[in-house]
Regions:
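Alpha-helical recognition/docking segments in bacterial nutrient-uptake
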Residues: 2, 61-157, 216
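Hydrophobic alpha-helical segments within soluble ligand-binding/sensing domains
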Residues: 144-170, 179-181, 188, 206-214, ...
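Short, solvent-exposed amphipathic alpha-helices that sit
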Residues: 76-90, 154, 177-196, 236-240, ...
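Short acidic capping loops at alpha-helix termini that bridge into adjacent secondary structure
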Residues: 165-167, 196-197, 248-253
Length: 315
């Protein structure tokens, strides 16, 4: 088995540096940390988590608290968990998965919280450890999220440049920052281009968007693009346009948001705004560990840009 001395030799650093990378990574430069991590990977060196926890008076556990219902039909949380777990593993940390009913079971060094809504503010405030939220919030907590406003602004500008005469926004009917930001990105670009915004909000289910298209089909002229706040909504729109014998993408365009899985099983594949879910998961892990190592010092927020991924639903 490889030892700490072996890692130090491989990375061409002192044993003290290796120990500091393992126990106090916030005190080491990123380039030096990567050298040590690379040596640890090559030698398959695993720090003794129990010894590390004892030395630091810590549990070496981060809790992931998921406050919304997880949908087993799409791997959104699988990508997020992969990013968090892989990053925590670099620092000899374990991940404990929780729901709102078992928040206080066991001890930990910090929390990553997903799916928080406004009614959860009191629950978050009562957590007695450093907290990082996955998703924009307005209660002053540190968070990681996509740049939702810029994401929809980019898609709206793309639709205009592709020559779509009418651009209809179908948002998610929820009073949360991410939903407002996405709609704002659309309305701002429409106004900047002298176009009239046309917005609707629906529950985030494909059957709702399909029913909406069916009900309003005669109101939508050819050369209309439907900009949807989720791939779920986009799938329902595509399905019903085809049901109404509309031509996609020649006469009607559709853009979704998320790019996790549903865009690939839609026919044709959706043009969508792909979020960097795994990378954002890793960023959540880095931020909460930094916060733990700095005695809860606020870390601010980090926004990730989305990628406009072209499929078969736009020209």
């Amino acid at each position: 088995l490889a030892t700490l001395t072996d890692v130090a030799k491989k990375a061409n650093v002192s044993k003290m540096t290796v120990s500091r990378v393992i126990n106090h990574p916030e005190q080491v430069r990123d380039e030096l940390k990567e050298l040590v991590y690379e040596a640890m990977r090559e030698l398959n060196y695993r720090p003794n988590a129990a010894a590390k926890a004892l030395a630091n008076k810590r549990t070496q556990i981060i809790k992931l608290l998921i406050l919304e219902e997880m949908d087993t039909t799409e791997p959104y949380y699988m990508f997020l968990l992969t990013g968090i777990a892989n990053e925590l593993d670099k620092y000899a940390y374990s991940l404990q998965l929780l729901t709102r009913n078992n928040v206080q079971i066991g001890d930990s060094d910090g929390f990553i919280v997903c799916g928080m809504r406004k009614e959860d503010e009191e629950l978050i405030k009562n957590l007695d450890k450093p907290v990082v939220l996955f998703g924009h919030n307005e209660m002053g907590e540190d968070f990681i999220d996509s740049n939702n406003e810029q994401s929809m602004a980019k898609a709206t500008q793309y639709a205009i440049e592709e020559g779509y005469e009418n651009i209809v926004y179908i948002g998610i009917d929820i009073d949360e920052p991410f939903a407002h930001a996405r709609e704002k990105g659309y309305t701002k670009v429409m106004a900047d281009n002298g176009k009239e915004a046309c917005t609707y909000t629906l529950g985030n289910r494909s059957r709702y968007s399909a029913a909406f298209i069916k009900e309003h089909w005669n109101e939508f002229q050819k050369n209309t693009l439907f900009l949807c706040a989720s791939d779920r909504l986009a799938m329902g729109v595509v399905r019903e346009i085809k049901e109404q014998n509309g031509n996609i993408p020649e006469d009607y365009g559709v853009i979704g948001h998320d790019g996790v899985f549903l865009d690939q099983i839609a026919h044709p594949h959706l043009t969508t705004l792909k979020q960097s879910i795994t990378e954002m998961g890793a960023a959540c892990a880095r931020m909460v560990l930094k916060k733990v190592n700095q005695d809860g010092k606020p870390q601010g927020n980090q926004l990730f840009e989305t990628e406009l991924k072209r499929g078969g639903t736009t020209r």
